[in-house]
């Protein structure tokens, strides 16, 4: 890991991205490129920071193959601030462009027309599948897990409202909320007025403990309201063999299918969410079936498989010079 400036919090797509905006990093980056002579430079969101733009505009005698990956879906201000003409000037420096999903491809294509290869995100399946649950949550209660940053677009307030109703009918349930940030005013109001009980606010946790929370869950709920081009958190739940309840937003529908790996509810609809939760709380066999289906599907998202797709794409983009290898990738 080579530090490239102090990250600055920047609003992006309903979230906060931490990127380096220091133009003074360019000489350092160019010296690094010149010294290492990378065969491939792979940039994620290539126009989003001074670091990626500096790497994008660098070249030396035998120009390295430059690849950009786009994760953004609706909500990013970057593509509204700059015209397609300006963005195209920089995108033309890329030899290949990747989108992590069809929604991400559609979004970036609307701003920068071109050919995009869809290669999804991947995860380390093994570390989730082998994680051990926390003993304190193995007390017979049905554990419902929310995991994500406490941002409005993640939709936690809808889950809290649904759980508040559910808890009266099914007192042997527990809601575990994992993620950094602060609850919004509506979420605080729901907890204060309804006092549903058995709500665990775990805060931010380590990667190791995150796997254990998934292993402790009977149901994973992803109530996001939009601005998601993919759903890595769904992959993590599937790797943990956990039944999923997810909102029917476009990004999630690329990862799971209704009735196969997940029950999908109408986004922002508390009643629809509650009905899906009730089905799973009532039906252990259905939870098992969804969990097993998810565990099978997630195999295609193993990093080993995704990395193979990336290497194949790098090779396609390589020049006709057969002596040019792929030993050095940034």
Residue ranges and their predicted role:
Residues 103, 122:
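Carbohydrate-associated surface elements
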Residues 187-208:
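Nucleotide-activated donor-binding/catalytic signature segment of Leloir-type glycosyltransferases, i.e.
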Residues 243-246:
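Short hydrophobic beta-strand element within catalytic cores of glycosyltransferases
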Residues 303-330:
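C-terminal alpha-helical cap of glycosyltransferases
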Residues 258-259, 263-270, 279-284:
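Conserved acidic donor-binding segment of nucleotide-sugar-dependent glycosyltransferases
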Residues 204-205, 212-217:
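Short alpha-helical donor nucleotide-sugar binding micro-motif in glycosyltransferases
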Residues 61, 80-97, 111:
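Membrane-proximal helix-turn-helix segments that form the acceptor-binding/catalytic region
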Residues 136-164, 176:
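Conserved donor-binding/catalytic core segment of Leloir-type glycosyltransferases
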């Amino acid at each position: 890991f080579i530090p490239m400036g102090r990250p600055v919090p920047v609003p992006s797509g309903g979230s906060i991205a931490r990127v380096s905006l220091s133009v003074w990093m360019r000489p350092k980056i160019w010296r690094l490129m010149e010294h290492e002579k990378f065969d491939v430079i792979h940039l994620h969101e290539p126009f989003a920071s001074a670091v990626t733009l500096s790497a994008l505009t660098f070249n030396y005698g035998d120009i390295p193959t430059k690849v950009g990956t786009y994760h953004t879906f609706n909500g990013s201000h970057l593509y509204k601030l700059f015209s397609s003409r300006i963005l195209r000037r920089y995108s033309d420096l890329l030899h290949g462009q990747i989108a992590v999903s069809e929604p991400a491809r559609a979004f970036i294509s609307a701003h920068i027309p071109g050919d995009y290869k869809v290669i999804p995100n991947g995860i380390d399946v093994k570390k989730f599948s082998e994680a051990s649950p926390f003993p304190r949550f193995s007390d017979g209660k049905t554990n419902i897990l929310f995991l994500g940053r406490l941002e409005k677009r993640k939709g936690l307030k809808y889950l809290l409202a649904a759980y508040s109703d559910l808890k009266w009918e099914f007192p042997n349930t527990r809601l575990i909320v994992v993620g950094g940030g602060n609850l919004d005013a509506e979420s605080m109001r729901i907890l204060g007025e309804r006092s549903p009980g058995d709500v665990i606010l775990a805060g931010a946790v380590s990667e190791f403990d995150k796997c254990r929370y998934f292993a402790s869950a009977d149901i994973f709920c992803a109530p996001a309201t939009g601005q998601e081009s993919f759903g890595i958190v769904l992959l993590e739940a599937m790797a943990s063999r956990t039944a999923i309840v997810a909102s029917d937003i476009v990004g999630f529908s690329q990862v799971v299918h209704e009735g196969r790996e997940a029950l999908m509810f109408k986004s922002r609809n508390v009643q629809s969410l509650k009905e899906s939760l009730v089905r799973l709380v009532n039906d252990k066999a259905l939870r098992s079936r969804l969990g097993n289906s998810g565990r099978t599907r997630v195999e295609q998202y193993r990093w080993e498989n995704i990395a193979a797709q990336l290497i194949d794409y790098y090779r396609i983009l390589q020049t006709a010079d057969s002596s040019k290898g792929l030993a050095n990738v940034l």
